[in-house]
Amino acid sequence: MYSPLCLTQDEFHPFIEALLPHVRAFAYTWFNLQARKRKYFKKHEKRMSKEEERAVKDELLSEKPEVKQKWASRLLAKLRKDIRPEFREDFVLTVTGKKPPCCVLSNPDQKGKMRRIDCLRQADKVWRLDLVMVILFKGIPLESTDGERLVKSPQCSNPGLCVQPHHIGVSVKELDLYLAYFVHAADSSQSESPSQPSEADIKDQPENGHLGFQDSFVTSGVFSVTELVRVSQTPIAAGTGPNFSLSDLESSSYYSMSPGAMRRSLPSTSSTSSTKRIKSVEDEMDSPGEEPFYTSQGRSPGSGSQSSGWHEVEPGYLRNPEHRGALHGMPSPTALKKSEKSGFSSPSPSQTSSLGTAFTQHHRPVITGPRASPHATPSTLHFPTSPIIQQPGPYFSHPAIRYHPQETLKEFVQLVCPDAGQQAGQVGFLNPNGSSQGKVHNPFLPTPMLPPPPPPPMARPVPLPVPDTKPPTTSTEGGATSPTSPTYSTPSTSPANRFVSVGPRDPSFVNIPQQTQSWYLG
């Protein structure tokens, strides 16, 4: 942004970055010219001549932009300390034009009045803060004794301590208006035709050795009217100034982050550091239509979207249930409600057969393993703060499925729907013979949220492997063949005892808790 050789670390404060393009280059020339004249008077005990003063003026005007910016940045840092902390944000926003002008109060001196500061590290000359603000941001050539000529606008609520440049004006007296007319007339006549005298000059010719009326006005300064107006309107950061513009300042601001986080070290202050930071901020935006990185309400961008999940990336898109189902590769809530009305009272693990297939089809290109770092294209999903899978978390956060990182999706699908989804996974439904089956506990599926079941004609008993070698028995009441372990009840027993104990599956395939599974016989 600046040359590292001319600025120190304290002069990279974003407060200075935002205000520096609005400082007039005339302020550097004016403050230094007054100091040179005062120093010359102390040394020689006489005032500087016109030729010497004009030479100093030309020297100051032709000074390098880096020197002017270094001086302005130091002065802005001093002004920042004199402005109350609660008004610093309003000061930047009003000067840069992002907010209507409001009062900006400064820290008072010991008597409760406007504080005075030295602008050139000189203790022998101090300036009122409101005078400094007018010279810096308006380019008005005021003396240090012109504090009484300043007037505050009627909108100012605290005229004694307000340093808002838009609330400070200069009172113009009758003498000023009178002198301005003749100075402007003389300047315009010289610019028209210096060789030919005008009618006013002919009428005001000295008679009998007496001076004319206009000759009684002596111009003490070395600036002409046109030159003064021209140099007072030139910003200090123009030309070869900082490599940032006002449009860049819209997206990077000091108030979006803490000052400690925004403070940069000296080696990183290259000319491209600001543009790199601005590009990285703009890359984190979802779309150009979003709200800007910095708003006038002082909203911090870091306060939002920190705890939002990846399914909240596109609220307008996910507000439609059909779109939400298409995004996740899962049936929408409306489809779930419709399937729940088909006559089945309780869900079962077999309902995840279609769900697991859709889940693997849609998410397998993204999720490659428990320690992988998924990345999605900006056209589909965009995650400004956190990746899809939190690295220290044991589960993949999903509204319907919990996926343990120790198992792959392929094994998960085989567990839920073995052999095309027509075997042991389909339990818990009424079979065509009227017998019902118990639920098989699955540690990978939470009970409250399960997908819809397949059609009931597809459900039928399937033989399950058991460690016991006893032959399977046949129930006498239901007419259906019991495919698994020996029975411990008779048809004449009570209904509470008409169950067949089922042993656990192969422990290498799935880890089922030690509670016994039972089938209802009858």
Curated annotation (Swiss-Prot):
GO terms for cellular component: nucleus. PROSITE patterns: CTF_NFI_1, CTF_NFI_2. Pfam families: CTF_NFI, MH1, NfI_DNAbd_pre-N. A motif (9aaTAD) lies at residues 407-415. Residues 1-194 bind DNA. GO terms for molecular function: DNA-binding transcription factor activity, RNA polymerase II-specific; RNA polymerase II cis-regulatory region sequence-specific DNA binding. It is found in: Nucleus. The keyword DNA-binding applies. Residues 451-470 have a biased composition (Pro residues). Residues 376-389, 511-522 have a biased composition (Polar residues). Residues 189-199, 296-309, 342-354, 481-495 have a biased composition (Low complexity). Residues 189-211, 259-392, 451-522 are annotated as: Disordered. Keywords: Activator, DNA replication, DNA-binding, Nucleus, Transcription, Transcription regulation. Binds DNA as a homodimer. Belongs to the CTF/NF-I family. Recognizes and binds the palindromic sequence 5'-TTGGCNNNNNGCCAA-3' present in viral and cellular promoters and in the origin of replication of adenovirus type 2. These proteins are individually capable of activating transcription and replication. The 9aaTAD motif is a transactivation domain present in a large number of yeast and animal transcription factors. This is Nuclear factor 1 A-type.
